[in-house]
């Protein structure tokens, strides 16, 4: 009742059961720009308690890969056994890798002017933003979440894991 009353007062016709999202024009994704499709590996699920241990990305323009970025991250953490089992990454693999500050500085430069794309982007971006903030690095890139898109567009899938979606 409140929504109908507000709609009538505003002179608009409500369409009940429909969600609408408004974006400022400045937030619309430019289809001509480059895209950075990326994935992180971490030591756990919470950016405040866990570390980034690998960043992998490809930059695309006009549907073609134009650059690549891949590095392990070594801040002296020991990789928990369950993370090694999940990712295949061992503590020894991090030896000689750059630290988080260096990796995120380089990744920031790599992503400059690009839209970011990730499967479960909220997870990856929470780690990127949290750890970048420790070094006064800010990521303002727009990003697209392929997990959200698959849930919205592919209703018949048994799940929306990346392997299933691909």
Describe the function of each predicted region.
Residues 95-112:
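Catalytic-core regions of hydrolytic enzymes
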Residues 60-64:
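Short acidic-glycine loop/turn motifs at beta-strand connectors
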